């Protein structure tokens, strides 16, 4: 698909939302994103790191960055809607700081719902989620 898309539209950027691990997803869900990155098929990956645990997030993002190296950008997906009771807006801000400190290209939030609109996004709009300068 990537080869055909690039032939039709040179310069197109191709990304994929992927499961966070690099091995089990290959065997269990036929999602070998580490291979796709190594072959230059993806420009960026968005691992679905839906955890309220900052230590787990840091471990996962460090591994994902190591797996991709300079071949693709890593844009970690965080899931305030998935872990809403444990992943408070304040905790999410700390996790965004962690992701930035680790060198990720950005972040994505799953999924747009009332809580994200009313509780999380106002804090992000206040400036904590602004790109690093």
Residues covered by each model-derived region:
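Hydrophobic, Leu/Ile/Phe/Ala-enriched alpha-helical segments that form helix-helix packing faces
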Residues: 1-5, 68, 99
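Aromatic-lined carbohydrate-recognition surfaces of secreted/lumenal glycan-active proteins
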Residues: 1-29, 73-82
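Short hydrophobic alpha-helical module
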Residues: 4-8, 39, 48
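Short, glycine/polar-rich helix-capping loops at beta-to-alpha or helix-loop-helix junctions
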Residues: 32-33
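Substrate-binding cleft of secreted/luminal carbohydrate-active enzymes
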Residues: 41-58, 64, 70-133
């Amino acid at each position: 698909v990537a080869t055909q898309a690039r032939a039709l539209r040179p310069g197109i950027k191709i990304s994929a939302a992927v499961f966070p691990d690099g091995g089990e997803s290959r065997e269990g869900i036929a999602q070998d994103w580490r291979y796709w990155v190594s072959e230059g098929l993806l420009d960026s990956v968005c691992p679905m790191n839906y955890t309220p645990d900052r230590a787990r997030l840091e471990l996962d993002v460090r591994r994902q960055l190591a797996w991709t190296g300079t071949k693709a950008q890593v844009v970690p997906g965080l899931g305030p809607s998935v872990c809403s009771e444990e992943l408070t807006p304040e905790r999410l801000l700390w996790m965004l700081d962690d992701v930035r400190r680790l060198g990720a290209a950005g972040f994505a939030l799953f999924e747009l719902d009332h809580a994200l609109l009313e509780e999380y996004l106002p804090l992000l709009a206040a400036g904590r989620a602004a790109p690093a300068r």
